[in-house]
Regions:
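N-terminal targeting signals for export/organelle localization
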Residues: 1-78
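Hydrophobic alpha-helical membrane segments, chiefly transmembrane helices and signal peptide h-regions
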Residues: 6-18, 100, 114, 130-132, ...
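Residue-level recognition of short loop/turn positions
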Residues: 18, 81-82, 178
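A short beta-strand-turn-helix
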Residues: 66-69, 74-96
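Short active-site neighborhood of thiol/selenol oxidoreductases, capturing the structured segment around
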Residues: 86-109, 115
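Structural microenvironment flanking redox-active thiols in thiol-disulfide oxidoreductases
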Residues: 109-146, 156-162
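Thiol/disulfide oxidoreductase modules built on the thioredoxin-like
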Residues: 141-148, 155-209
Length: 209
């Protein structure tokens, strides 16, 4: 391989690592590995900032239900705000929109108000953020600025990267009530109409206009 070709290959890899990959469901490595609870030494956000954010508590998740094929990975992640740690593979009983984001990710910042509007308009669908390798105080400050009140968990060590096969953020998963991932959006969502349409198409829930 010539130096020029090697440089082009390296540049393409860096581009993919810096932003979401092409739209599509892709393949997930889920439902087959042993349960994991990543360790973290990251300090939680300040209590006064959490009080200002008024985040909903993280949802309860079933610790005993077996993971499903093509479901969320069997990872237990700490809550960014109040509430228990969340076992992703144990989220059942309601459709979920799960958004991987970070305060350092520019397209993620643009998406958050869209998810906040969906959360306010559609109680039949639960939203959960996964804040990736972020400063918790910066993350909560962004949620305040974006009007987000739905909960997020913290992925301080990028534990979701291998099972969900993501190369960049944001990434959004549409998960049915039985825990099966119906669709993975690997590119930024750029409009409310696009997000609402994805919810209606893959979760079967009509979003009020």
């Amino acid at each position: 391989m010539t130096v020029r070709v090697a440089a082009l290959v390296l540049g393409a890899g860096l581009l993919l690592a810096g932003c979401g990959s092409a739209q599509g469901a892709g393949s997930l490595v889920t439902g087959t590995s042993a349960p994991a609870t990543p360790t973290s030494s990251v300090a939680p956000p300040p209590a006064e900032l959490l009080a200002q954010a008024r985040l909903e508590p993280c949802p309860a998740s079933d610790p005993t239900v077996p993971p499903v094929a093509d479901g969320l990975p069997d990872l237990t992640l700490p809550c960014l705000g109040a509430g228990p740690a969340v076992r992703l593979a144990g989220l059942r009983g309601t459709p979920y929109v799960v958004n991987l984001w970070a305060s350092w990710c520019k397209p993620c910042r643009a998406e958050l108000p869209l998810f906040a509007a969906l959360d306010a308009a559609t109680p039949e669908v639960a939203l959960l953020g996964v804040d990736v390798e972020d400063d918790p105080a910066s993350a909560v400050s962004l949620l305040v600025a974006s009007g987000v009140h739905y909960p997020s968990v913290r992925d301080d060590s990028r534990a979701t990267r291998l099972p969900l096969r993501w190369t960049g953020l944001p990434m959004t998963l549409f998960v049915a009530a039985d825990g099966v991932v119906q669709h993975v959006e690997r590119a930024p969502i750029t409009s409310q109409a696009q997000l609402d349409g994805l919810v209606e198409r893959y979760l079967g829930v009509t979003v009020p206009s």
